[in-house]
A protein has these predicted regions:
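Hydrophobic helix-coil surface modules that form long, contiguous segments used
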Residues: 4-18, 23-179, 208
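Hydrophobic alpha-helical and helix-loop surface patches within well-folded domains
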Residues: 81, 111-285
Length: 285
């Protein structure tokens, strides 16, 4: 898994420069069109950000099967990717990846790259279509034509046009992580807020929308799908470890204070806003 793997420019916006180093938590990047070439042993299957520009030279499930495959006679293949209008680029490679492509809403290609727990990774494919359909209807259309869900990384982490998810052994965990990380395609990658400065605006918003999506897609019919967020925030509020919601993500004194403030309190914020102004009005904001 290759993430945070290249020197990044500091973002400059109306607030000035944001030169915060990446310390394994939140990050903020510069909008750009990425052209990336990766030369790697021909046995490896690659997935990640961007559209593959030379699928008939690569194969590995990317090619048009109605056309001839023309691989170069070499030990390595050079993968050419183009990613328009994104602010990050991530990729993963493994010779044992299984690569499936499923058509999602609005003809978006959903790519799945995985090695183990095949039954669960097959099962998540239709649910991923359902999740993207829900997010499209609730938030707005996914702005790219491809999204990849890749078994790799550490836990689950969102990147431009893709997510990396470690597991798959437990389907509930795989579904929940997929729902949350896919939600980040809107709340952080499309919205492009400074998640390092305002982590609750991406983690909290993603937690809010993934709870709604899980309730609908899995037909759980919970009266309050945000109950766990309320319970988590209540424990933090009673712990005397809570810090101001404006605290920078890298400046929390306690990791639990960061996690609950960003994820749970952020979700509670939207749930409470919906209670105050109405769900219909919230959907329009």
């Amino acid at each position: 898994s290759m993430t945070q793997w290249y020197p990044k420019l500091a973002e400059y916006d109306f607030e000035g420069w944001h030169p915060n180093p990446y310390i394994g938590r939140e990050f903020h990047g510069v909008w750009s069109d990425y052209t990336v070439s990766l030369s790697i042993d021909k046995s490896y299957v690659v997935g990640g950000t961007g559209y593959l520009q030379n699928p008939q030279e690569i194969g590995h499930g990317y090619e048009n099967t109605e056309k001839s495959l023309k691989r170069p006679d070499s030990k390595k293949l050079t993968w050419l990717f183009y990613a328009p209008n994104v602010h990050d680029f991530a990729w993963a490679a493994d010779p044992d990846f299984i690569h499936d492509i499923v058509e999602g809403p609005n003809s978006v290609e959903l790519h799945f790259l995985y090695k183990t727990h095949v039954e669960n990774w097959k099962k998540i494919q239709q649910h991923s279509v359902d999740l993207m359909t829900f997010f499209n209807n609730k938030i707005g259309p996914y702005p790219w034509k491809q999204y990849s869900i890749i078994q790799g990384g550490d836990g689950g982490m969102e990147y431009a046009m893709c997510t990396l998810i470690t597991g798959g052994e437990n389907y509930g965990s795989l579904f929940g992580t997929t729902a949350h990380e896919m939600g980040h395609a809107w709340f952080q990658h499309a919205l492009a807020n400074n998640e390092a400065k305002h982590p609750w605006m991406d983690e909290g918003f993603a937690s809010y929308i993934d709870a709604m999506a899980e309730n609908v897609v899995l037909k759980k019919n919970k009266k309050n799908p945000f109950l766990r967020s309320y319970q988590s925030y209540r424990r933090l509020a009673n712990s005397k470890m809570e810090q101001p919601q404006t605290t920078h993500s890298d400046r929390y004194s306690f990791n639990v204070a960061y996690s609950v403030s960003a994820y749970s309190k952020g979700a509670v914020f939207l749930a409470q806003l919906g209670y105050l102004i109405g769900e219909e009005a919230l959907d329009k904001t």
